Amino acid sequence: MLALRSGLRTALAPRVLTPQVCSPFATGPRQSNGTFYEFRTYFLKPSKTNEFLENFKNSVHLRTAHSEMIGYWTVEFGGRTNRVFHIWKYDNFAHRTAVRKALAKDKEWQERFLIPNLAFIDKQEVEITYLVPWCKIGTPPKEGVYELATFQMKPGGPALWGNAFKRAVNAHVELGYSTLVGVFHTEYGALNRVHVLWWNESADSRAAGRHWSHEDPRVVAAVRESVSYLESQQNTFLIPTSFSPLK
């Protein structure tokens, strides 16, 4: 009987809830907002890259009639070449589904571009990303070049490394040598991956700015903290196409 009473007291006693760790990268607010960005990478046949780009340039209005294109670039260096990289904005997943269905029924898009050019593509990669809550899409001051810095962070999620990563990015922003376009956290694709898109006036101005930043104690301290959570990093140098909204 005493054992039974003790068990009942334990079962009925108020539970003490363990505080949850919050992070500025938490997916909740982004998913409630719904807006996400689709990263598409096409690996093209070397002999067909220029033809593919010219054909898309002539048909881009057919595609953008269905959803917003943020930017369209070719990869100059930083991995495999003969690649194109583009970003598309969607209000939510229902919006994307509706767009894909509409494109499948758009005969002009299918006949003028998609069907004739599919054979030019060796491989496609697609990621679904959200802008981090502390970042909005930036507007570059003029035409230039772009760098996509991709960080593969340690497992544990933004609750583990989000604050340190934010401080590292902002330390570079505050120096003013480069314009931050966006910070994107992958939802579908490799997890614990963050993409940071930067604008620079030129490759040489970027190199000079990076050299300067490495001598700034604020940047050095912030990066030293963030890098403890980093598994790998890859930088890709991007050239905007003539039809890219982001130039």
From Swiss-Prot:
The record's section on Pfam families has: NIPSNAP (PF07978)
One of the protein's GO biological processes: mitophagy
UniProt keyword Cytoplasm present: yes
Q: Which SUPFAM superfamilies does this chain map to? A: Dimeric alpha+beta barrel (SSF54909)
Q: Name one GO cellular component term.
A: cytosol
- This protein's UniProt keywords: Cytoplasm
InterPro entries with a match to the protein in the record: Dimeric_a/b-barrel (IPR011008), NIPSNAP (IPR012577), NipSnap_domain (IPR051557)
Q: Which domain of life is it from?
A: Eukaryota
Tell me the residues on which N6-succinyllysine occurs: 45, 48, 57, 166
Question: Which cell locations does it reside in?
Answer: Cytoplasm, Cytosol
The record's family statement is: Belongs to the NipSnap family.
Protein name as annotated: Protein NipSnap homolog 3B
